Amino acid sequence: MRKVHLFLVLVHFIYISTSRSDSISERDILLQFKGSISDDPYNSLASWVSDGDLCNSFNGITCNPQGFVDKIVLWNTSLAGTLAPGLSNLKFIRVLNLFGNRFTGNLPLDYFKLQTLWTINVSSNALSGPIPEFISELSSLRFLDLSKNGFTGEIPVSLFKFCDKTKFVSLAHNNIFGSIPASIVNCNNLVGFDFSYNNLKGVLPPRICDIPVLEYISVRNNLLSGDVSEEIQKCQRLILVDLGSNLFHGLAPFAVLTFKNITYFNVSWNRFGGEIGEIVDCSESLEFLDASSNELTGRIPTGVMGCKSLKLLDLESNKLNGSIPGSIGKMESLSVIRLGNNSIDGVIPRDIGSLEFLQVLNLHNLNLIGEVPEDISNCRVLLELDVSGNDLEGKISKKLLNLTNIKILDLHRNRLNGSIPPELGNLSKVQFLDLSQNSLSGPIPSSLGSLNTLTHFNVSYNNLSGVIPPVPMIQAFGSSAFSNNPFLCGDPLVTPCNSRGAAAKSRNSDALSISVIIVIIAAAVILFGVCIVLALNLRARKRRKDEEILTVETTPLASSIDSSGVIIGKLVLFSKNLPSKYEDWEAGTKALLDKENIIGMGSIGSVYRASFEGGVSIAVKKLETLGRIRNQEEFEQEIGRLGGLQHPNLSSFQGYYFSSTMQLILSEFVPNGSLYDNLHLRIFPGTSSSYGNTDLNWHRRFQIALGTAKALSFLHNDCKPAILHLNVKSTNILLDERYEAKLSDYGLEKFLPVMDSFGLTKKFHNAVGYIAPELAQQSLRASEKCDVYSYGVVLLELVTGRKPVESPSENQVLILRDYVRDLLETGSASDCFDRRLREFEENELIQVMKLGLLCTSENPLKRPSMAEVVQVLESIRNGFGS
């Protein structure tokens, strides 16, 4: 018995000695890991010292009862460096959590030894390369998170080889392509997976709902397709399903809304159609319902109003009709309602005012009538109220001014009347205020000058009168924000306040006495008589010497002269370098009758080259359509605001001409033609090339891409309000003598042909390959991201030398974006390159190609801004883009 006791003591001693020995060894392993760290900005590893207590003093380290490293948790510490292979010698580690750092490279192959690992979380780092296949050998793994890195390639089929214990997998926010392996259905204990924000194609794996405990499915922002309604409805345990921003079609799986545990349901930005259908017994757990940007039809089912816990309801941009259910006011938890861009009619339910937690109410572009209910003023935490594009009438209720937290107030394009309440100036947090295209009258309250947070302001197209308040904050929005108010005057309008009786219309003006009125009338009669005499004298002189009295506001175009020979057109020049004599314009404008001087034909008219003595040339666009422009004043307002814009990559406006029979836009002549001509013209002038301009090397193409991006960034960010192009294409990118880009036709969106019921007019057809999906679908919420999409197509043109849409054969159509994406996903990126290119860095072309694909993402939210595009291009050129 004594021998047995001694034996046990000896074994215990040996075990303790071994533990201490291994513990010392693990300390060295961790110190080696520390040595591989190139930057530790928060000194997170300062406690990792050679004489420190591994289990008690090493920050982020947890040991098991035996003294071995059990967990490494160093999250959000911004550590930089590579992952040390030596960690593979930690024999008992279960958790490796390095979330929120800056590690580069890939997971070392040696990590296949970590058979005890339960958790790998390296999310939000800068790791790259393919997803390591050895992960499939880690049979104890429960939790795998590789999200928000730069992993590429396909998901290894073997990843789900030994996944009996796996509960959660996230590969979100990477550059993964290919399909979702069908083997994922073998993971019987998988609770959820997140593959969102990648480039995955194909369908959801069949029998995905055979996984008995599946609760979370997120595949947002991919290229997945197919009909999912029947399969998804079998996942009875679902808590979250996010299928947003894909290409799914058929019926949306709305039956999921009745599942007991469902809290989050997103099927937005797909191609789902049909009716929502009646929702019986909506889940009391449901908080988020987003089915926006699909092709849903029918009415909003009243069953949706039974979702008592719902916080967000977004059915925007569908084809829904009927009215807004009055019972929506009983959904007491709602904080966001978005129903805009549908065919919904009726009135705005008053009971919406009982939603005390409502923050966003967006009902734009519907067919609503009646008034904006005063009850909405009870929604005291409301941040956004957008009821634009309806048929609402009545006055702007002063009670709405109780919405002191409001940031977006958009009432434009309705039939509102009355005056602008001065109390609007109390909305100190408002950033977006649009009252345009109504029937508002009276003066603009000076109190609006106190709105210091405004980034958008517009009161155009009303019946406002009086003097625009001389407040820089208001005047900074330019004349377009005040245009088409017949009795409004003062800066920034060109209408002085001593003309047209504008100032006299102000309600703030003092009442005039009868005697003063009599004096004014008498003076006016005398002045009128003097004007008549002067006019007669001027007319007589004009007949004697017509050519001597021509000013820069008249021009003798043949089509604009009436039967008496009187010139009736108006010419305005923005440039002092252009000739202003009668003879010069008479000779120069004869080119408009000569087809040999046509240098381009676009969506809104033909472009001619007009030349003058002394070698001066300008481009003259002869408009064939005025789009949404209704009269001369509106024409001059639109062109006038563009005359002062100056940027090295913009083709500057030189002036305009307007008559009842002809409208011209004068702009800078750029000698090397358009980018389209240089890329695609079969016989390019001045070269021996049979296809395009061989002088357009990659260096020049890159500079064209960068210059165009800078021009668009200027229009979007430096112009107040922002100027949208909405017609970006290679024919509107001109090249000067040094092949620098000059963007033309900017700010002319109102002149574009109006979209018809089939999408686009025939004249606009040649731009179809450039049009963003939301614009082609006639979404009235055009944004800067529409220009980003078109610009992305131009990037792909520059890299490939191909047109946006080509027909290689009679029954075949090649869409450039899809063509490039397919080749990139199959690892054949170099097959996309324009074969005429020589002396280029392959990686640079690939980076630009990827940027083009990012810019042409289906979802506008996934596209970068033009300012970000400029930064990316500059980093690519400086060698940091790879």
Swiss-Prot record:
Pfam families: LRR_1 (PF00560), LRRNT_2 (PF08263), PK_Tyr_Ser-Thr (PF07714)
Glycosylated residues in this chain: 76, 121, 261, 266, 321, 341, 402, 417, 426, 458, 463
UniProt-annotated binding residues for ATP: 599-607, 621
Name assigned to this protein: Probable LRR receptor-like serine/threonine-protein kinase At1g12460
Cytoplasmic membrane side: 537-882
Organismal lineage: Eukaryota, Viridiplantae, Streptophyta, Embryophyta, Tracheophyta
Highest taxon of source: Eukaryota
Repeat recorded as keyword: yes
UniProt cross-references to CDD domains, sorted A to Z: STKc_IRAK
One Gene Ontology MF term: protein serine kinase activity
Membrane-topology annotation of the record: Single-pass type I membrane protein
Compartments, as annotated in UniProt: Cell membrane
Topological domains, Extracellular: 22-515
LRR repeats: 92-113, 116-138, 140-162, 165-187, 189-210, 213-235, 237-258, 261-283, 285-308, 309-331, 333-355, 357-379, 381-404, 405-427, 429-451, 453-475
Family label: Belongs to the protein kinase superfamily. Ser/Thr protein kinase family.
Catalytic activity as recorded in UniProt: L-seryl-[protein] + ATP = O-phospho-L-seryl-[protein] + ADP + H(+); L-threonyl-[protein] + ATP = O-phospho-L-threonyl-[protein] + ADP + H(+)
Its EC number(s): 2.7.11.1
Signal peptide (residue range): 1-21
SUPFAM superfamilies membership: L domain-like (SSF52058), Protein kinase-like (PK-like) (SSF56112)
Residue span(s) of domain Protein kinase: 593-876
Annotated Gene Ontology cellular component terms: plasma membrane
Disulfide bridge map: none
Modified residues (Phosphothreonine): 589
Transmembrane region(s): 516-536
Modified residues (Phosphotyrosine): 770
